[in-house]
Design a protein with these regions (language model features):
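Glycine-rich, positively charged N-terminal anion/phosphate-binding segment
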Residues: 1-60
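Alpha/beta enzyme core
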Residues: 48-82, 86, 90-150
Length: 150
């Protein structure tokens, strides 16, 4: 059944979306024939920006689901404190998840994360607990560390 199908978009950056970057808005757009659940994979490091992007995605793009990406291992992303580096800072992770869940209202939010940065810094248990505590609908574990890449 189509109601059970979920296709998550490419990852978009909350800041670029809020700032109105055309390329990011194109990634977040859906065709008229795309009636299956509209799901966006969202990335960012600032709770307020992520909350604003969530509101805009729901109100302007008709998004039915937000998937937060805390698993990106790309050095450019993790070096700036994003992606797989966020769960290393559990208070920030909690603030981000809380702000997005609150902004999403009845729209479901899920989170994706890795085991950790490397085998000496595993964060997945805390990340899962934070997600559960903040009301995400589901968590997804990419069962590799950021150091293992893809």
């Amino acid at each position: 059944s189509q109601d059970r199908c979920l296709y998550v978009s490419e990852m978009i950056t909350a800041r670029a979306f809020v700032e109105g970057h055309a390329r990011t808005h194109k990634l977040a757009s859906f065709g008229a024939d795309e009636t299956t659940r509209r799901s966006i994979q969202l990335y960012g490091t600032h709770p307020d920006t992520l909350a604003a992007a969530t509101r805009l995605l729901i109100e302007e793009c008709g998004v039915h689901h937000i998937d937060m990406n805390f698993g990106c291992p790309v050095r450019k992303v993790t070096a700036s404190g994003g992606g797989a580096a966020i769960p290393v800072r559990p208070k920030l992770l909690q603030k981000i998840v809380r702000s997005v869940v609150k902004s999403a209202g009845s729209v479901p939010v899920t989170i994706k994360f890795r085991k950790g940065i490397d085998d000496s810094l595993l964060t997945f248990l805390d990340a899962g607990r934070i997600g559960e505590g903040e009301g995400v609908r589901a968590v997804a574990l990419h069962a590799r560390t950021a150091a293992q890449l893809y």
